[in-house]
C-alpha cells in the first residue's frame, strides 16, 4: 500500500475510534433482584415527599422513588441532581436553580419549573413553618429555571431546602398529583427516581422496578423488594437462609452472629442518628418533671456507655446532646456520668425521696431496647415508668400531633446542622416540640438572620448551653447502624451520615 493510502487508512481508523469513544454508552439491561429485610414497617406517607416529619426514615423510600434538586450522594453532601446548578445573589435574597434538561417522571411527563414550584408549595413536613416565614415568593423564570426570593437573608436556606433536614426539594409531577389527589398519590406514587413503584402490601412489602430512563445512570438491579420484618431473630434467619440479601438494624448478639457467620458481612455505618428522651410535662408546674433536679436525676440514672457497647458492639457513641457531634455549630456539653446515688439525692431534694410514678414512656417499637435501658435506669433510682411501644408510622403521627404525655423516646437521623435540629425539636412551635422557653426562642430568631458565621455560632452555642443547663432532654446515644449483607451482593454504596444503603442505582449483584 502506498504512503498516501496508509495515511488515509490511519485517518479513517482514528475517525472510527473517535466516533466510538464519543458515542453514548448503552447501559446493560437491569437484571436480578435484591431483597431487603427491614426492621420497620413501611407506611404510605413515606412515598410522598410532602410529609417528611423531620426524621430520616422516609428517605429510605424517597431515594428509590423520587429525586431532589440537590441531595447528599457519595462524596458530596450537596450533589447537583434534578438541578444541575444554582446561584445565590450577592445580597443573599435570591436563589436560582437551573434544572437538568430532559428529565422525565416515571409516567413520561417532563420535569419543569412548574413541578418544582408545585412541590414546594404543597410541602407540609418538617421545616415548612420556616419556609413560609422566610420565603417571599417562588418565581418560574422559564421551564428550566426557578427562583426563590427570600424576605431577608437566611443563612440556612440551602441547609433546610437541599439536605434531608427536609424533603421540600424532592419533586413530584404537578399534573399527576392534581389528577389523583394526595391519597391517590400515596397509593400509586409517580416520581423521577431510579426505581418506579410496582406494588405495596401494607405490613408486608414494597416492590419497585428499575426505571431505565433515570437521568444519572440506569440501575443495574432490576427489582428491589423491601420486606417489613420487625423481629431481629427472624431477619437473621432469613439472611442466613438466603431469603434476603440485606437485613437492616441488627443489635448486640444478633449483630455479633452476623459478624461471625462465613459468607455474611456486617456493615457498620455511623449516621447522624441521635436518640433522646423528651420530658413532655416539664412546662406543667404540677408535674415532677417541671423540677430541673428531677430531669437531671433521670439523666444521671442512665448508663449510656454500657448500653452503647452492648447494643452497637462498641460502635455507638454515648450522647450528651440531641444534636450529633458531627453537625455544624455543635457545642460540646459535659458528659452525663452514670451516678444513681446522686440521682436519688436529687430526687430527695426535689421532694421525692421514694421516687414517683412517671407513667408511660412512649417509643417507636424499633427502639424498644433503648427505651427499656432508660426505664431500667429510672426504676433503679425510684422513677417508675412503663414502656409503651408503637409501630413507627403511628408513633411519628402521634408524636407530631403532640399526643404523648409523660416521657417519649425520640430520635432523628435527619441531616442538617444544629439549627435544623433545634428548629424541629427545641423551639416553641417546632414540628416535634412539646414546648419551649422564651430565651431560647429569641436566640433562635436572632441566629436565623445572622450572616456573620462567628456570631451565629455563638448564638447557637448559647442555645445548646441553655438546653444542657435546663436538662431539657435526656440524650441517650448516637447510634451505629449494623446491617447484614448476604453473599450475592457485590456493592453496597454509602452516603456519609445516611443510615440506609443508597443510592440504589449503584447497587450491584455479583456475577453468576
Task: Name every feature range the model reports, one short phrase each.
Residues 195, 285, 292, 313, ...:
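Structural transition elements
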Residues 41-59, 82-83, 109, 157-167, ...:
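A structural "hinge/loop" feature
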Residues 100, 122, 183, 211-257, ...:
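Ligand-site clamp/hinge motif
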Residues 98, 130-176:
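Surface-exposed binding/hinge segments that line
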Residues 84-127, 141, 147-149, 235-238, ...:
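Aromatic- and charge-enriched surface segment that lines or borders ligand/interaction sites
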Residues 37-90, 121, 190-191:
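N-terminal lobe/hinge region of extracytoplasmic solute-binding protein
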Residues 31-38, 201, 270, 274-275, ...:
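Detector for C-terminal structural segments
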Residues 63, 73-77, 164-219, 223, ...:
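Gly/Pro-rich hinge or "lid" segments in bacterial periplasmic/extracellular proteins
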Amino acid at each position: 500500500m502506498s504512503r498516501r493510502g496508509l495515511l488515509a487508512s490511519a485517518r479513517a481508523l482514528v475517525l472510527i475510534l473517535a466516533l466510538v469513544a464519543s458515542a453514548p454508552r448503552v447501559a446493560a439491561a437491569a437484571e436480578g433482584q435484591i431483597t431487603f429485610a427491614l426492621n420497620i414497617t413501611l407506611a404510605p406517607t413515606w412515598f410522598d415527599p410532602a410529609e417528611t416529619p423531620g426524621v430520616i426514615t422516609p428517605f429510605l423510600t424517597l431515594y428509590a422513588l423520587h429525586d431532589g434538586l440537590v441531595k447528599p450522594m457519595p462524596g458530596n453532601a450537596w450533589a447537583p441532581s434534578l438541578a444541575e446548578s444554582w446561584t445565590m445573589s450577592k445580597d443573599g435574597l435570591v436563589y436560582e436553580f437551573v434544572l437538568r434538561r430532559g428529565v422525565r417522571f416515571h409516567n413520561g411527563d417532563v420535569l419543569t419549573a412548574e413541578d418544582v414550584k408545585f412541590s414546594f408549595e404543597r410541602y407540609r413536613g418538617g421545616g415548612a413553618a420556616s419556609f413560609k416565614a422566610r420565603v417571599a415568593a417562588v418565581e418560574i423564570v422559564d421551564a428550566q429555571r426557578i427562583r426563590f426570593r427570600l424576605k431577608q437573608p437566611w443563612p440556612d436556606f440551602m441547609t433546610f431546602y437541599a439536605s434531608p433536614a427536609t424533603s421540600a426539594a424532592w419533586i413530584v409531577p404537578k399534573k399527576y398529583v392534581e389528577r389523583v389527589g394526595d391519597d391517590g398519590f400515596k397509593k400509586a406514587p409517580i416520581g423521577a427516581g431510579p426505581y418506579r413503584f410496582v406494588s405495596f402490601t401494607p405490613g408486608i412489602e414494597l416492590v419497585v422496578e428499575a426505571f431505565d430512563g433515570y437521568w444519572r445512570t440506569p440501575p443495574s438491579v432490576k427489582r428491589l423488594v423491601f420486606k417489613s420484618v420487625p423481629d431481629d431473630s427472624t431477619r437473621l434467619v432469613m439472611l442466613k437462609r438466603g431469603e434476603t440479601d440485606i437485613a437492616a438494624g441488627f443489635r448486640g448478639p444478633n449483630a455479633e452472629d452476623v459478624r461471625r457467620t462465613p459468607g455474611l458481612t456486617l456493615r457498620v455505618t455511623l449516621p447522624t442518628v441521635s436518640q433522646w428522651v423528651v420530658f413532655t410535662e416539664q412546662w406543667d408546674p404540677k408535674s415532677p418533671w417541671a423540677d430541673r433536679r428531677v430531669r437531671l436525676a433521670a439523666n444521671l440514672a442512665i448508663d449510656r456507655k454500657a448500653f452503647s457497647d452492648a447494643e452497637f458492639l462498641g460502635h455507638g457513641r454515648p450522647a450528651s446532646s440531641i444534636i450529633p457531634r458531627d453537625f455544624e455549630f455543635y457545642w460540646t456539653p459535659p458528659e452525663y456520668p452514670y451516678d444513681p446515688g446522686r440521682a436519688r439525692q436529687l430526687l430527695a431534694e426535689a421532694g421525692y425521696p421514694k421516687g414517683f410514678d412517671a407513667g408511660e414512656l412512649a417509643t417507636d417499637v424499633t427502639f424498644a431496647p433503648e427505651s427499656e435501658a432508660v426505664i431500667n435506669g429510672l426504676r433503679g433510682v425510684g422513677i417508675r415508668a412503663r414502656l409503651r411501644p408503637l409501630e413507627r408510622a403511628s408513633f411519628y403521627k402521634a408524636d407530631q400531633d403532640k399526643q404523648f404525655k409523660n416521657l417519649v423516646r425520640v430520635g432523628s437521623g435527619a441531616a442538617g446542622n444544629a439549627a435544623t435540629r433545634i428548629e424541629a425539636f427545641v423551639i416553641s412551635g417546632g414540628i416535634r416540640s412539646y414546648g419551649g422557653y422564651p430565651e431560647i426562642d429569641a436566640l433562635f430568631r436572632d441566629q436565623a438572620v445572622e450572616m456573620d458565621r462567628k456570631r451565629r455560632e455563638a448564638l447557637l452555642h448559647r442555645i445548646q448551653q441553655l438546653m444542657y443547663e435546663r436538662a431539657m432532654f435526656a440524650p441517650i446515644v448516637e447510634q451505629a447502624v449494623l446491617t447484614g449483607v448476604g453473599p450475592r451482593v457485590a456493592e453496597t454504596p454509602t452516603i456519609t451520615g445516611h443510615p440506609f444503603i443508597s443510592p440504589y442505582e449503584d447497587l450491584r449483584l455479583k456475577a453468576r
